[in-house]
């Protein structure tokens, strides 16, 4: 693991870097370049998904990096149309082949799709992949507390991670509470709120000026000090480097309080209770 990024110890003892590189909305050929840049900058965790269409480019960059496989933490996700026990196992094989890997470090159910009611069977297939040593940890993404409670009641393995939309405008207090109770790591997607106004908020700009940092670095540091795992995405080399330079300063109590006061429970992405796109 990179010495620059400290690890989070997941509930099964596996170490996951607290900051990783996301490739959502990055075309395959561009993903290869971006992941190569990220690995050179010191990132050792890469977050992709079947639906992103860039598992191949991600895998090529990992192979070309020359880094030992065990030094890179790879996450991918099962897409909604593949939910169900047997179809999950087939979809995993496809993802693994595209990535060119023998195993993935973390496999996530991308969305719960409660209206289709397949996430429990899907997760049971995840448990088989874990038992067979094909994944090192299993988890979920975009699961609301009610979905987590059902999963905990009907399956055997507590999810290692729940990756959810989380940023200063959507702080997810209830989700983080159940995660803490159950030993589930909280991972933030869109940790910078997709930049939509968040990085111009006066409170964040003022804290950035105080620390001589960028607003993005301030928001990432806020996440890290809360204990969240973060996966900022960028295809701009300077931003990729900027986003990992957040381990040599700290926010004080007043800074953290000022950012925590910005919560509006405002989602930028879909509502997991109703989202059912396959």
Model region roles, listed by residue range:
Residues 11, 88-109, 128-132, 154, ...:
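CE4/NodB-like, metal-dependent polysaccharide N-deacetylase domain
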Residues 45, 103-106, 137, 161:
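Residues at the N-termini of beta-strands
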Residues 26-29, 49-57, 81-86, 114-117, ...:
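Acidic-and-aromatic substrate-binding clefts and catalytic sites of carbohydrate-active enzymes
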Residues 1-72, 278:
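N-terminal binding-site loop/beta-alpha segment at the start of enzyme catalytic domains
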Residues 69-82, 106-112, 166:
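A short, structured active-site edge motif that brings together acidic residues
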Residues 2-8, 56-63, 91-94, 145-148, ...:
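Alpha-helical scaffolding within the catalytic cores
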Residues 112-278:
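Beta/alpha (TIM)-barrel catalytic core signal, keyed to glycine-rich beta->alpha loops juxtaposed to Asp/Glu
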Residues 27-39, 84-99, 146-149, 170-171:
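Short, acidic/polar
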């Amino acid at each position: 693991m990179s010495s620059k990024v400290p690890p989070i110890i997941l509930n099964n003892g596996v170490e996951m870097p607290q900051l990783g590189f996301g490739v959502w909305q990055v075309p395959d050929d561009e993903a290869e370049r971006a992941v190569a840049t990220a690995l050179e900058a010191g990132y050792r965790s890469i977050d992709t998904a079947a639906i992103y269409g860039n598992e191949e480019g991600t895998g090529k960059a990992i192979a070309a990096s020359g880094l030992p496989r065990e030094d890179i933490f790879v996450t991918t996700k099962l897409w909604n149309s593949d939910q169900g026990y047997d179809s999950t196992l087939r979809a995993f094989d496809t993802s693994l082949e595209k990535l060119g890997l023998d195993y993935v470090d973390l496999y996530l159910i991308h969305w719960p799709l409660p209206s289709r009611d397949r996430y429990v069977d899907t997760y049971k297939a995840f448990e088989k992949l874990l038992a067979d040593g094909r994944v090192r940890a299993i988890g979920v993404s975009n699961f609301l507390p009610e979905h987590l409670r059902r999963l905990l009641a009907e399956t055997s393995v507590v999810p290692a991670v729940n990756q959810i939309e989380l940023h200063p405008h959507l702080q997810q207090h209830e989700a983080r509470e159940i995660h803490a109770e159950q030993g589930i790591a909280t991972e933030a997607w869109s940790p910078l709120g997709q930049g939509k106004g968040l990085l111009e908020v006066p409170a964040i700009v003022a804290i950035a000026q105080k620390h001589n940092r960028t607003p993005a670095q301030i928001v990432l540091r806020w996440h890290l000090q809360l204990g969240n795992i973060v996966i900022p995405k960028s295809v701009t080399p300077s931003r990729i480097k900027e986003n990992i330079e957040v381990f040599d300063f700290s926010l004080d109590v007043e800074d953290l309080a000022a950012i925590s006061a910005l919560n509006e429970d405002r989602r930028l992405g879909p509502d997991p209770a109703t989202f059912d796109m396959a």
